[in-house]
Amino acid sequence: MLDIKLIRENPELVKNDLIKRGELEKVKWVDEILKLDTEWRTKLKEINRLRHERNKIAVEIGKRRKKGEPVDELLAKSREIVKRIGELENEVEELKKKIDYYLWRLPNITHPSVPVGKDENDNVPIRFWGKARVWKGHLERFLEQSQGKMEYEILEWKPKLHVDLLEILGGADFARAAKVSGSRFYYLLNEIVILDLALIRFALDRLIEKGFTPVIPPYMVRRFVEEGSTSFEDFEDVIYKVEDEDLYLIPTAEHPLAGMHANEILDGKDLPLLYVGVSPCFRKEAGTAGKDTKGIFRVHQFHKVEQFVYSRPEESWEWHEKIIRNAEELFQELEIPYRVVNICTGDLGYVAAKKYDIEAWMPGQGKFREVVSASNCTDWQARRLNIRFRDRTDEKPRYVHTLNSTAIATSRAIVAILENHQEEDGTVRIPKVLWKYTGFKEIVPVEKKERCCAT
């Protein structure tokens, strides 16, 4: 939620930012907010004036009664003032609701470094890492997407898609999951289950080493938490509701972690607060018909390890760089080639002031795919959830800044590992950093193994 003071003092900044985001219909909202706000403040002043007048009348009534003088006229006037105050308070309340309707639906103000663009095609790659394995049939596309800034190894054989590798390795059952639950669900099996759990523990250990507090949050939250954490559009496209309850299944641990300190004033000396959440995530994927319908890249449920930071406003941009670097280090240890992308205004979403994505190179698909998102939400969530801090008890509280980043979304990390570490026969090498968690160094095709999870 935006600060009403920003709209009062710099409405053109807000309008220009909406234009950059492509939110042209909402530009006129700024003038409507200013109009309503002026009316709201005028009525508040009138309420205060009437209260002052009523108090003066009350004093005068007291004086007259002591003298035995009549007070009927003053009492009548006082009653009229009380009635008028009540009417004005109702009007002020209605005006506030109208103002809040707009404020709660305006996106965050973007950082100056966010590129202006319409959609994901206008996102800007800012750095690359790793040596990619590229099938010769994908080389031209790879060179274009990597801008010639990545090392690569040419594969003469065509790498398989992760969904085919899962079948070869006996790692998933999609047909039975569809029977039981419908599309975009899956049973993970055998070594892939161990790999999923290994990724969670690996990411968790690395972030604990960096000072993050591990958290398993509630998997369901109340509506005020979702409204405070995300845009209203997500209620239609993303979030599952529990029928007849004020509870919603979390689409990410970010949301319960954001709500953790709702309506609190934090002690400034405790900032930054660093949390690493571990949870399942549940998503409708309502707006993605036809996209990634096979496999485990875009699904209704998956496990995720999430970084979440409460910081001082003046430190949040430094923390934004830190959390994306944390995620990069994880994928470097997993030996996954990737690029980091600065997300443009048209693809940014409402909550973030700036967002980086890590996109892993997928040899089977022949393109980069998103595996991490890291956002600085500045005070947008903190205002909605009323999360503030102060350094001294006599100091006026200020809103914190909140930041979040994927550490590991296990399903997408598994896709990246399968496609990047496959051999021609379908065997998949396990990154060395995971050996101590998996207990095995490779996964071989079903027909080549005697039992699951052999070392």
Curated annotation (Swiss-Prot):
Its EC number is 6.1.1.11. Keywords: Aminoacyl-tRNA synthetase, ATP-binding, Cytoplasm, Ligase, Nucleotide-binding, Protein biosynthesis. It catalyses: tRNA(Ser) + L-serine + ATP = L-seryl-tRNA(Ser) + AMP + diphosphate + H(+); tRNA(Sec) + L-serine + ATP = L-seryl-tRNA(Sec) + AMP + diphosphate + H(+). L-serine binds at residues 252-254, 306, 406. ATP binds at residues 283-285, 299, 370-373. Homodimer. The tRNA molecule binds across the dimer. This is Serine--tRNA ligase. It comes from Pyrococcus horikoshii (strain ATCC 700860 / DSM 12428 / JCM 9974 / NBRC 100139 / OT-3).
